[in-house]
Amino acid sequence: VLTDAERKEVTSLWGKASGHAEDYGAEALERLFLSFPTTKTYFSHMDLSKGSAHVRAHGKKVADALTTAVGHFNDMDGALSDLSDLHAHKLRVDPVNFKLLAHCFLVVLARHHPEEFTPSAHAAMDKFLSRVATVLTSKYR
């Protein structure tokens, strides 16, 4: 559970990032695919080249889901329930991939917002993304 101070850190940092949802989401996915090529197997139907419309569109979906999570700190399970079902039952995404993508998002945020990406903001954002990953993998059990 995030503390009030951590929620403020996440809300502040994500407030700056959410206006760039498509760009940041695409960049995080591109980093994921380059750093962890096995993750591409879930996207064999897409053009995964840098800046492709597919990557940008999916990046926006991912970032929009994070925006939803930021808006529902107290009911993340409910807010992300459909997404959790989709990834667990239909897409069958390996749960470790959520952690890998979370790391890529941290890199993107640090790159674009170095002044705001303080040690406390980093820790809060990491905790938040870990919570999102836990929610998304909750239906796997």
From Swiss-Prot:
Keywords: Heme, Iron, Metal-binding, Oxygen transport, Transport. InterPro entries: Globin, Globin-like_sf, Globin/Proto, Hemoglobin_a-typ, Hemoglobin_oxygen_transport, Hemoglobin_pi. SUPFAM superfamilies: Globin-like. The keyword Transferase does not apply. Heme b binds at H87. It holds the Pfam family Globin. Residues 1-141 form the Globin domain. It comes from the Eukaryota. The keyword Iron applies. One of its GO terms (molecular function) is haptoglobin binding. CDD domains: Hb-alpha-like. One of its GO terms (cellular component) is blood microparticle. GO terms for biological process: hydrogen peroxide catabolic process. Red blood cells. O2 binds at H58. Belongs to the globin family. This alpha chain is the A variant from the minor hemoglobin II. Its sequence differs from those of the alpha-1 chain variants A and B at nine positions each. PANTHER family: HEMOGLOBIN FAMILY MEMBER (PTHR11442), HEMOGLOBIN SUBUNIT ALPHA (PTHR11442:SF48). Heterotetramer of two alpha chains and two beta chains. Involved in oxygen transport from the lung to the various peripheral tissues. This is Hemoglobin subunit alpha-2. It comes from Tachyglossus aculeatus aculeatus. The lineage of its organism: Eukaryota, Metazoa, Chordata, Craniata, Vertebrata.
